[in-house]
Swiss-Prot record:
Cellular localization per UniProt: Virion
Name of this chain's protein: Coat protein TP2
Organism: Thermoproteus tenax virus 1 (strain KRA1)
Protein keywords: Capsid protein, Virion
Gene Ontology CC: viral capsid
Amino acid sequence: MKVLRLGFTDKYIEKQEPIDVVFDKYQPLGYVAVVELPSRIPWIIEIQRREWIERFITMPRDIFRELSFDIIILRRKLEPTPQYRMIRDIVSDLRQSRGYASGMVILPNGLTYDGDLLEGIEVMEGVDVIAYTLGLIDF
């Protein structure tokens, strides 16, 4: 079991403190982590490759401070697609399958794109991880 500390700031959390991310299980699909937020249900974070875990947790903390969402979820790898696929389509798939109303995409290289400004942005099929932040959701 490996515990990583993420400095994540969220306007919906009264006590803004680091969140424990526990990587306690490995499956062929990738690492699985359960993140529990105060007064929120646990969310499962799936990660395809270990190197993306290390790259993700070393992203500038300013990125986390600027995002006003509940939690970050890394997507599981989608079914085989053409060599290039619009990020907008991936976001659309996530919204339809998970019921997300809004959000932002964070690419593995740390670049961020608003969900409504994805025209013309393409990502190769080989990209394993896209972080997706939740908007307001009623549980």
